[in-house]
Amino acid sequence: MSERSGIFAGDDPFVLARAWLAEAEASEPNDPNAIALSTVDADGLPNARMVLLKEIESHGAGQGGFVFYTNYGSAKGQEIAQAGKAAFVCHWKSLHRQIRVRGLTETEDGPQADAYYASRSLKSRLGAWASDQSKPLSSRGALMADVARVTAEQGTNPKRPPFWGGVRITPLEIEFWADGAFRLHDRFQWRRGSVDDPWEVQRLNP
């Protein structure tokens, strides 16, 4: 494959990412929107964890972003706030494909975050209030006591916590990878110097 065609075809990486995710949703048995999110702490030590990608935004002309939700006081929330950058990879074993993303971060704590929070189950909404994410916890019993307290305080229609919301990654690099025989994989990298620059696309060695 000397030029982009087939599964790599298209002029907008966000549209392409959406298409790949849609295929994964039809074939991947568990959490096709799971991503391994990487951040760094103040000392530059990397951290990685699995989170769920909730939206691939596509605004046309090669602009868009990737959105997930978290507690802003968590380790990842604090590291993202400090660095303003993050990376992730999503790998689909059923498709033998993956997407890697590196980019700049910003919080999404307006109506979009409110709407997503409201779409969650009541127990998940209350859990967001109860969990002081990433902080030490004496016991599971203590956590459940916090859940009971929050349930009594918030009732059946809790508002989104001010410390919980979305994070948008606006990419500077997106790589689309597909497995090839004898490890001769196909890799295409979309890259730009800033979010306002046009994308440059190149094939990479396996």
Swiss-Prot record:
Pathway where this protein functions: Cofactor metabolism; pyridoxal 5'-phosphate salvage; pyridoxal 5'-phosphate from pyridoxamine 5'-phosphate: step 1/1; Cofactor metabolism; pyridoxal 5'-phosphate salvage; pyridoxal 5'-phosphate from pyridoxine 5'-phosphate: step 1/1
Cofactor: FMN
Function (record text): Catalyzes the oxidation of either pyridoxine 5'-phosphate (PNP) or pyridoxamine 5'-phosphate (PMP) into pyridoxal 5'-phosphate (PLP).
Protein name: Pyridoxine/pyridoxamine 5'-phosphate oxidase
GO molecular function, one term: FMN binding
Keywords: Flavoprotein, FMN, Oxidoreductase, Pyridoxine biosynthesis
InterPro entries (alphabetical): Pyridox_Oxase, Pyridox_Oxase_CS, Pyridox_Oxase_N, Pyridoxamine_oxidase_dimer_C, Split_barrel_FMN-bd
Subunit structure: Homodimer.
Keyword hit for Flavoprotein: yes
Superkingdom per UniProt: Bacteria
Residues noted as binding FMN in the record, renumbered to the chain: 49-54, 69-70, 76, 98, 133-134, 177, 187
